[in-house]
Amino acid sequence: MAGSATVEKRLDFGLLGPLQMTIDGTPVPSGTPKQRAVLAMLVINRNRPVGVDALITALWEEWPPSGARASIHSYVSNLRKLLGGAGIDPRVVLAAAPPGYRLSIPDNTCDLGRFVAEKTAGVHAAAAGRFEQASRHLSAALREWRGPVLDDLRDFQFVEPFATALVEDKVLAHTAKAEAEIACGRASAVIAELEALTFEHPYREPLWTQLITAYYLSDRQSDALGAYRRVKTTLADDLGIDPGPTLRALNERILRQQPLDAKKSAKTTAAGTVTVLDQRTMASGQQAVAYLHDIASGRGYPLQAAATRIGRLHDNDIVLDSANVSRHHAVIVDTGTNYVINDLRSSNGVHVQHERIRSAVTLNDGDHIRICDHEFTFQISAGTHGGT
């Protein structure tokens, strides 16, 4: 359990930037790249067992050396020595937990855990109409980011899908913060940030919605209309699609010079996000469990790890025995607030809600997923799942 690691010294871990381990605020060098990759996997999956086989796959993918298992044990032993040398009981913090090891730490001793907590608090505050409080929480969440996720370990393939999913979560936090700031009457203050974000993420329509709203509420109607034309052209030229109904309706209101109710809009958006967050924790207070329900067989595949890989090879968490499925086809990442699916450059793609995904997509309870001939329903439910 997370509360089992009661120590006098302050142990802290960072994933939202280069991997970081500090004790009482002092950075602790954590060894070779492979040893740091083991630590990263343990922090990503904190308070959950990580199998030795999963660690081997993370380090060597399909080509582990003959001594891979012994190397994993050696890396863990070295990490324990680092902890012990700093006065922390390594057998409590980094314990054997079949089929591997578990890093037991409070969630608030990891930057990702703090990001999730602050983002969740901010969204709940916005849904209740407390926009100043929402802005403070969301700003605190974004301050946890020091740079690209695990930037020093990008050579390891497990990092990319995890980082991509967290960037999705970060963009959502930026969007929610901008909406809260606009609801507080500070539309002009967020324009520069939103201009930079829409340049970096040109297909994220919610960011464009906030930028266009901020322009309009700052008496810059021509800029608002120009921004709509830009996103419409970008979506058409690059993706072959039109803006969604929210953006189209916003543009129509601006053309007619109608007033915008920023507070009502912010509460509505946040309330929808709260519904998604609350799916994770049922009324009983038990942590929700996510599954992929195989429509053909009725089998339920639990999504228990921080990242669940799907593909043809047997080193995947969910193995799909089909020639059309790529060796490593897709991954579903639990970011702490959302489940995000990402196509791992597969040959035949991943379809969510009957559309092929072009980037990471946040899953909602009940979503239909198709991977070649295999069809699933994404489900979040409390307790055990009878189809496993």
From Swiss-Prot:
Entry PTM: Phosphorylated on threonine residue(s) by PknH, PknA and PknB. Phosphorylation enhances the DNA-binding activity of EmbR. Dephosphorylated by PstP.
GO molecular function: ATP hydrolysis activity; DNA binding; GTPase activity
UniProt KW Kinase keyword: no
Family matches, as InterPro entries: AfsR-DnrI-RedD_regulator, BTAD, FHA_dom, OmpR/PhoB-type_DNA-bd, Sig_transdc_resp-reg_C-effctor, SMAD_FHA_dom_sf, TPR-like_helical_dom_sf, WH-like_DNA-bd_sf
Residues of the DNA-binding region: 2-105
Gene Ontology terms: biological process: phosphorelay signal transduction system; positive regulation of DNA-templated transcription; regulation of DNA-templated transcription
Highest taxon of source: Bacteria
Pfam families reported in the protein's UniProt record: BTAD, FHA, Trans_reg_C
FHA domain ranges (all copies): 308-357
GO CC, alphabetical: peptidoglycan-based cell wall; plasma membrane
Keywords of this entry: DNA-binding, Phosphoprotein, Transcription, Transcription regulation, Two-component regulatory system
Impact after mutating S326A: Abolished phosphorylation
Protein family per UniProt: Belongs to the AfsR/DnrI/RedD regulatory family.
Function text: Positively regulates the transcription of the embCAB operon. Exhibits ATPase and GTPase activities.
Free-text note regarding domains: Contains a N-terminal winged-helix DNA-binding domain and a regulatory C-terminal forkhead-associated (FHA) domain, which mediates binding to a Thr-phosphorylated site in the cognate kinase.
Quaternary data: Interacts with RNA polymerase. Co-immunoprecipitates with DarG in the presence and absence of darT.
Protein name: Transcriptional regulatory protein EmbR
Natural source organism: Mycobacterium tuberculosis (strain ATCC 25618 / H37Rv)
Name of the gene this protein is made from: embR
